[in-house]
Amino acid sequence: MKKILLVLVICLLLATSCKNEPNPFLVKKNHIGLLTDSTQVKDLDAIFANDSVVRYIAGDEFTGSVNTIEIFDKGGIKLLDLSPVDALDSTSVISTVRIIDDRYKTEQEISTLSTFGDIQNAYKISKIDNLINSVVVSVDKINASFTIDKKELPSSLRFKTGEQIDEVQIPAKAKIKFFMLHW
């Protein structure tokens, strides 16, 4: 009887100790770690309880600007920039997440340390936008856009903003400057 009770206690301990914790650095289409597309601004302090949440209050309601919320880890390293749908509204959801830290990775291991070639191998590219100082590569599968500095492009493409840039024109070794998720 004692052996059965001991086995039962051990099984219960093993079952309760095997929690399946979500990866706080996993990037998917509708969430980043515990942050989801339905997370409200008021919930950020609970989600990032071990980190630092920095909110800037614009103070000028006439500007209509969105207040960026910055997330830093306990060591002071910047992790994320969050933009809510409505500025100064604690019930607003997050619309855009700018991923700064290289620990954040997609299921295909794409991070800020990745290259354009890595993105091409992992995802189907939906669109490429040619901006003044950068190129933005959009991937609809994960609602992400990857920004590449034009310094990574051949010199013939660096100063042309009106022309469409094709996938084949971007070098595979071009580094990602940062990437964003749009919800």
Language-model features: where?
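Short acidic-hydrophobic surface loop/beta-edge motif
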Residues: 6, 69-72, 137
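Bacterial Sec-dependent N-terminal signal peptides
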Residues: 1-25
